[in-house]
């Protein structure tokens, strides 16, 4: 019984708790699939899509976002010192041979409890796997985690992701 208690405390300390200096209120991800509002309090993802009539509609996707996923994104944010980045940080793909200009953006917006925001944007032409051409090794893990989470949400709600060309 004593060992189970020790393992439980270790689990809480290392895996399920948020970072000590956590002041992130919510996380918003914008990409070609839509806009995903991720929040621990809401536990749902809201997605905006353009309709044929050029209106921006909000569609509630019935998908639970686990605290584990959000805490992992927060942990990557703080462990890689991304709070030291400027409030609007843009990255371009390392794909210099592309015939297409960078046209698809994946943007992560962090909303903080003090009302501030931080935008991290990655521009790429969208062909093949964009994460293979990611320029900054320090920021890449957070984009990998967000890409996996949005892919999981889209696939589980019946909206299959497009096959890379």
Give residue spans per PLM region:
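Positively charged n-region of N-terminal signal peptides that target proteins for export
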Residues: 1-5
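C-terminal motif of bacterial Sec signal peptides marking the signal peptidase cleavage site
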Residues: 15-16
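Short, well-ordered, aromatic-rich surface patches in folded extracellular/luminal domains
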Residues: 19-28, 92-165
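Post-signal peptide N-terminal segment of mature Sec-exported envelope proteins
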Residues: 25-44
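A short, structured beta-strand/loop element
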Residues: 42-50, 102
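A short-motif feature that recognizes glycine-rich, charge-decorated loops
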Residues: 52-86
